[in-house]
Amino acid sequence: MPGIRVKENEPFEVAIRRFKRTIEKTGLLTELRAREFYEKPTAERKRKSAAAVKRNHKRLRSQTLPPKLY
């Protein structure tokens, strides 16, 4: 579990902001949301496969030339 040390004379809001930033960097919240409910292995494979297809289409769109406008 990530933690921070509150500096002397540091406002509470700043300490909370630093804590949120460290949590975001470690990816703890995203992992927690992913593990919140059980996902069947087939559903997980299907979701990952769909994400891979989406990434592939996005990469292909950026690599292709724009259509000629004449």
UniProtKB/Swiss-Prot annotation:
- Biased composition regions of type Basic residues, renumbered to the chain: 45-61
Any one Gene Ontology molecular-function term assigned to this protein's record: structural constituent of ribosome
* Keywords in alphabetical order: Ribonucleoprotein, Ribosomal protein
Any Pfam family hit: Ribosomal_S21
Region annotation Disordered: where it falls in the sequence: 40-70
So which residues are the signal peptide here? none
GO cellular component annotations, sorted alphabetically?
ribonucleoprotein complex; ribosome
Query: Disulfide bonds, which pairs?
Result: none
Q: Which GO terms describe its biological process?
A: translation
Which InterPro entries does the protein's record reference?
Answer: Ribosomal_bS21, Ribosomal_bS21_CS, Ribosomal_bS21_sf
Q: Which family does it belong to?
A: Belongs to the bacterial ribosomal protein bS21 family.
State what protein this is by name: Small ribosomal subunit protein bS21
* Biological source species: Aromatoleum aromaticum (strain DSM 19018 / LMG 30748 / EbN1)
